């Protein structure tokens, strides 16, 4: 049972002197089967070990939260077994409570012991609580940015907080690959509910500084393990329905899911809803409410299909010039404009055909390159949005989109949500 969207009015005024604790991911070493049998890591750096022990104590013994790096984005974690900890997550983020949370575990063994309340018995399989349809995927992709949906255990057999599921019959779970995240979960021996560690609706954080910007004074500790390598949230799949469904594109591509999932995933469909209807329940995070949005307006330049004739014969620079003119006419207060480029827009063309345009002489333009491959663009996306919004303080952001294949499916999913209705064929 969730508490309803508006319970956040109960937010307490308690503030923290938020500490950033440096940790070294390279000093954390797991055995090859630790994600299965739950073996604890070896930590060679004393400073890293001390920070993790302190953070693990907060997760295990208090109702508070800790921000920590994962391979996808920074997460804001609290005990998935403690209603008050889950409430602390919702309060710190100002997140509606009908938006479910992903539970992170360090191993299959921990999933069984702590979520299903089933200690491993001799002669039984550690995988008994995981439907067989998922096993090809998790054998290849765990630890990693893959989240699966499992049936919620009966209440008498599980301590999993109902607040993590938003009153759904399923819960979302994954084993992260980042060694800091894995070590935190393992040392606390506590499944951790963790959405992205940003203020609700903001772009997800891929650096500890992003977390500090949004959640300073709202949480006690941020573990700084450097930049996140993937750059967008995990891929969420539902193998409990027929056909199986990719609910949220993320760190693993649709193509990888189909290739590695075996025959059962060959007909995997993609959830096409941009958002759900008011009052409709969601099975996974990211499907409801405004997401990934800077303060500045975002205009997404959606690449048109080759040969469809939508913009045939129209020069991209001329098209972009007209779009800028339209925005300036609608809002005379626009002074600084950012253009986030990817595969086709070139700095030299922007300089000669846009920035030197006499009509724009009073405006400041900033170019931020996202990358030349889907992987680079995915990794850099949220950091680039935050840079131009928070550091450069622009008034308007244009983003050059990419085709929705490979990493492009996750990239465009995030950008469409950031831009809302401001998506222009380009």
From Swiss-Prot:
Changing residue 107 to F: In SUA5-1; suppresses a translation initiation defect in a CYC1 allele at an aberrant ATG codon. Its main location: cytoplasm. Required for the formation of a threonylcarbamoyl group on adenosine at position 37 (t(6)A37) in tRNAs that read codons beginning with adenine. Likely catalyzes the conversion of L-threonine, HCO(3)(-)/CO(2) and ATP to give threonylcarbamoyl-AMP (TC-AMP) as the acyladenylate intermediate, with the release of diphosphate. Required for normal translation, by ensuring translation fidelity at the level of codon recognition, appropriate translation initiation selection and maintenance of reading frame. Also involved in telomere replication. Gene3D superfamilies: DHBP synthase (3.90.870.10), Threonylcarbamoyl-AMP synthase, C-terminal domain (3.40.50.11030). It comes from the Eukaryota. It comes from Saccharomyces cerevisiae (strain ATCC 204508 / S288c). L-threonine binds at residues 72, 104, 174, 194, 234. GO terms for biological process: regulation of translation; regulation of translational fidelity; telomere maintenance; tRNA threonylcarbamoyladenosine metabolic process; tRNA threonylcarbamoyladenosine modification. It is found in: Cytoplasm; Nucleus; Chromosome, Telomere. GO terms for molecular function: ATP binding; double-stranded RNA binding; L-threonylcarbamoyladenylate synthase; nucleotidyltransferase activity; single-stranded telomeric DNA binding; tRNA binding. The lineage of its organism: Eukaryota, Fungi, Dikarya, Ascomycota, Saccharomycotina. Residues 49-252 form the YrdC-like domain. One of its GO terms (cellular component) is mitochondrion. Present with 538 molecules/cell in log phase SD medium. PANTHER family: SUA5, THREONYLCARBAMOYL-AMP SYNTHASE. This is Threonylcarbamoyl-AMP synthase. InterPro entries: DHBP_synth_RibB-like_a/b_dom (IPR017945), Sua5-like_dom (IPR006070), Sua5/YwlC_C (IPR038385), Sua5_C (IPR005145), T(6)A37_SUA5 (IPR010923), TC-AMP_synthase_SUA5 (IPR050156). It catalyses: L-threonine + hydrogencarbonate + ATP = L-threonylcarbamoyladenylate + diphosphate + H2O.
